[in-house]
């Protein structure tokens, strides 16, 4: 249901960029990115620190950057792991989604393993089992100069994967259930169905309509997509199976 796939993320190291305005202008003709947000990130960061331009760029965008790397100094691509919801919106309310950790959460938990910009479970099982799914970050001990520039690496510690979560959900039952709901429930209506083993309480399938695609959250949801979800009168983010209130 959920896996990790490589995402191609586009970065900028300002001090290596040469004519930064020219490079970003050329880049913006082929790749859409938030230039104002990038400028704010650059203002907060030192010029030798890389700054994310855009996450999870397409293969076509990767090809453009690679083909023009000589005229885009300081701009480079890194392959990094990204959460992948294999069946898109299937069981989305049960699985939940990821989102960037808020400043409030950072201040409240004071967990040194988190920093601003990290993605954490925001809802569903992603949120409930965040502590066991997140694993441990890799890090390295380095020698730096007075400005904080890295001179050499002293020791490296590889990252540790999080635990796997085994569910009682039956994918085939879940697929048939959601297919049946979409075939019988009007697009402008809502509803939910839960299939359980009475003897054990195991949840075999849990569907809520309308649903959403958690992949849109994995690398940071756009303001347009977020507004479309929260402004929808049928509240697709609500799990009606467990959060709805209904008359007897």
Where are these regions (language model features)?
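Residue-level detector of short, conserved catalytic/binding motifs and their immediate flanks
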Residues: 8, 92, 191
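Helix-start/capping segments and mature chain N-termini
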Residues: 1-33, 125, 151-154, 164-186
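Bacterial peptidoglycan biogenesis and beta-lactam-recognition machinery
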Residues: 1-3, 17-19, 25-37, 70-75, ...
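Small/polar-residue-rich segments within soluble enzyme cores
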Residues: 25-29, 43-162
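Solvent-exposed, acidic/flexible segments
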Residues: 16-21, 46, 54-62, 87, ...
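A short, polar/charged loop-to-alpha-helix boundary motif
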Residues: 9-24, 211-231
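Solvent-exposed coil/turn segments that connect beta secondary-structure elements
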Residues: 6-8, 13-17, 56-58, 70, ...
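Active-site loop and adjoining helix of the penicillin-binding protein/serine DD-peptidase-beta-lactamase fold
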Residues: 157-202, 206, 218-248
